[in-house]
């Protein structure tokens, strides 16, 4: 944004330099410069000093441009020169927007003439030299014209923001509405405005616990842990500190005796119809037969069922399958299959036929016989270990019927 009267920034024309000591120490020019808005600027422009007239004209042009931009319907801009009390509409924005107290008197960034001796004592580094004073006077013309390389000293008692906003009392909002900065945390006001209560070492008055997900209170106001508080709320008394002993195992109750067989050892104690204790065996017997268990069935030891699967049956089944596999081995590459016998059993090997030897039976295990339906037996070729694919060994045409079960020579391939 171009400001009229500030074209000297882009050209070789230097900024107005206040080198006259009378301008530095004089308060009349300063009072006329910041007293009553544009009227005071017009009065200052008619001053006899040419440098003061140039500075007043520049500030007046900047003020008018800022007023026109501030009232734009698109961009709402708060007055940048709100530190000047005489400018209309220049009340400190930050103080009335966030503070509930009265408005603080606006103050400028630059110290007044009366503060100069105290700053000289507080500034041992010599920052109150001519260069620093010229920078501060340039800031009076426009805050945007500050030299980027020059920063304000930390020892300078600045009581307002760079744009003249009042000292803001609350640490949670900055005068411009920005989030908290690191300077706000280091401010003494920030530490004083948040009084933090010291950590209390709570302890349950009943069990002495110091850690619990929820602290409760009894009727007298003492702290209770969550467990003790719930117990007191449900039962109306304090929770016992010592856990009750677990119930003794039923089978090991001392002095318990079965009323039927007089045994003292059992896996489970039961009760009969009259409520007397009985052992597990007598109780189950009475439950199934509705009669007391006979004393002749009593045994000294406790008989338990073997719930593990026995391997005897598996061994017998494996041996039977091995014998059947040895009998199913073909001899000479052929197998005779009975198609339809008088007994109605289809798929049985013809009786009286010896199939292979025991040494070659393992080669054909897992290959069952081919079952065909028909009134008589059929002769089917069976693939041997050296004949290749089984599909190439079987005939594709119709199988001729025979009147008797016999073994013939192998078919020529």
Swiss-Prot record:
Residues 305-318 have a biased composition (Basic residues). InterPro entries: Transcription_factor_GATA, Znf_GATA, Znf_NHR/GATA. The modification Phosphoserine is found at residues 26, 49, 72, 142, 178, 187, 310. The keyword Transferase does not apply. GO terms for cellular component: nucleoplasm; nucleus; protein-DNA complex; transcription regulator complex; transcription repressor complex. Residues 109-128, 297-325, 392-413 are annotated as: Disordered. Residues 117-128 have a biased composition (Polar residues). The modification N6-acetyllysine is found at residues 233, 245-246, 252, 308, 312, 314-315. There is a cross-link at residue 137 (Glycyl lysine isopeptide (Lys-Gly) (interchain with G-Cter in SUMO)). Keywords: Acetylation, Activator, DNA-binding, Isopeptide bond, Metal-binding, Nucleus, Phosphoprotein, Repeat, Repressor, Transcription, Transcription regulation, Ubl conjugation, Zinc, Zinc-finger. Its main location: nucleus. It is found in: Nucleus. Coiled coil: none annotated. Residues 203-222 are annotated as: Required for interaction with ZFPM1. Erythrocytes, and fetal hepatocytes. PROSITE patterns: GATA_ZN_FINGER_1, GATA_ZN_FINGER_2. Residues 249-315 are annotated as: Interaction with CALCOCO1. A zinc finger (GATA-type) spans 204-228, 258-282. One of its GO terms (molecular function) is DNA-binding transcription factor activity, RNA polymerase II-specific. One of its GO terms (biological process) is erythrocyte differentiation. Residues 395-413 have a biased composition (Low complexity). Transcriptional activator or repressor which probably serves as a general switch factor for erythroid development. It binds to DNA sites with the consensus sequence 5'-[AT]GATA[AG]-3' within regulatory regions of globin genes and of other genes expressed in erythroid cells. Activates the transcription of genes involved in erythroid differentiation of K562 erythroleukemia cells, including HBB, HBG1/2, ALAS2 and HMBS. Interacts (via the N-terminal zinc finger) with ZFPM1. Interacts with GFI1B. Interacts with PIAS4; the interaction enhances sumoylation and represses the transactivational activity in a sumoylation-independent manner. Interacts with LMCD1. Interacts with BRD3. Interacts with CREBBP; the interaction stimulates acetylation and transcriptional activity in vivo. Interacts with MED1, CCAR1 and CALCOCO1. Interacts with EP300. Interacts with CEBPE. The two fingers are functionally distinct and cooperate to achieve specific, stable DNA binding. The first finger is necessary only for full specificity and stability of binding, whereas the second one is required for binding. This is Erythroid transcription factor. It comes from Rattus norvegicus (Rat). The lineage of its organism: Eukaryota, Metazoa, Chordata, Craniata, Vertebrata.
């Amino acid at each position: 944004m171009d400001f009229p009267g500030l074209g000297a920034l882009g050209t070789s024309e230097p900024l107005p330099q206040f080198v006259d000591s009378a301008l530095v120490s004089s308060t009349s020019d300063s009072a006329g410069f910041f007293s009553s808005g544009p009227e005071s600027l017009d009065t200052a422009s008619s001053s006899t000093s040419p440098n003061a007239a140039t500075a007043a004209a520049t500030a007046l042009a900047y003020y008018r441009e800022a007023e026109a931009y501030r009232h734009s319907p698109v961009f709402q801009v708060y007055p940048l020169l709100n530190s000047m009390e005489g400018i209309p509409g220049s009340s400190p924005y930050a103080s009335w927007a966030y503070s509930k107290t009265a408005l603080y008197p606006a103050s400028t960034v630059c110290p007044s003439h009366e503060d100069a001796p105290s700053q000289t004592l507080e500034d041992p580094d010599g920052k109150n030299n001519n260069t620093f004073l010229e920078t501060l006077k340039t800031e009076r013309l426009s805050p945007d014209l500050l030299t980027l390389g020059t920063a304000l000293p930390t020892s300078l008692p600045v009581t307002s923001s760079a744009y003249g906003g009042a000292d803001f009392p609350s640490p949670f909002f900055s005068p411009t509405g920005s989030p908290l900065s690191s300077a706000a945390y280091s401010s003494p006001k920030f530490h004083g405005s948040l009084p933090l209560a010291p950590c209390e070492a709570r302890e349950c008055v009943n069990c002495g616990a110091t850690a619990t997900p929820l602290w409760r209170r009894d009727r007298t106001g003492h702290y209770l842990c969550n467990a003790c508080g719930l117990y007191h709320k449900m039962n109306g008394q304090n929770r016992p500190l010592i856990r009750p002993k677990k119930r003794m195992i039923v089978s090991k109750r001392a002095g318990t005796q079965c009323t039927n067989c007089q045994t003292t050892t059992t896996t489970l104690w039961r009760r009969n119809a009259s409520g007397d204790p009985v052992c597990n065996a007598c109780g189950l017997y009475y439950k199934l037969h509705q009669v007391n268990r006979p004393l002749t069935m009593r045994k000294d030891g406790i008989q338990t069922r073997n719930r593990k699967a026995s391997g005897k049956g598996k061994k017998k089944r494996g041996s039977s399958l091995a014998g059947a596999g040895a009998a199913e081995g073909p001899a000479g590459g052929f197998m005779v299959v009975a198609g339809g016998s008088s007994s109605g059993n289809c798929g049985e090997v013809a009786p009286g036929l010896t199939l292979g030897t025991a040494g070659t039976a393992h080669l054909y295990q897992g290959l069952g016989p081919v079952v065909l339906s028909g009134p008589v037996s059929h002769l089917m070729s069976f693939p041997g270990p050296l004949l290749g694919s089984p599909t190439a060994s079987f005939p594709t045409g119709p199988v001729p019927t025979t009147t008797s079960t016999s073994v013939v020579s192998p078919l020529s391939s």
